Amino acid sequence: MDLAHLQDVIERTYGERDRERGVPSTVAWLAEEVGELAQAVRKGDHAQRVHEFADVLAWVASLANQVGVDLGEAVQRYARGCPRCAAVPCSCP
């Protein structure tokens, strides 16, 4: 699934509810999911990690939808490698 499709699915599935919840609460939910991902990385098995990565991506897509950010456009920042030094691999100090 590409990022545009993810954003579309999240919008159609949760968009109305997400807008009612609002940006501050969505950020809080995203932070909670990042915490769950961190725990799964430390202590979980592969299936738990996949689950938590999916949840984080869904909340990122929700937040992006609410604030009008196209994630496909956003990731272009990394299209040529490191956004600071433009090298692959990064050669930043």
PLM features: residue spans?
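Flexible "arm" and connector segments at domain edges
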Residues: 1-53, 57-93
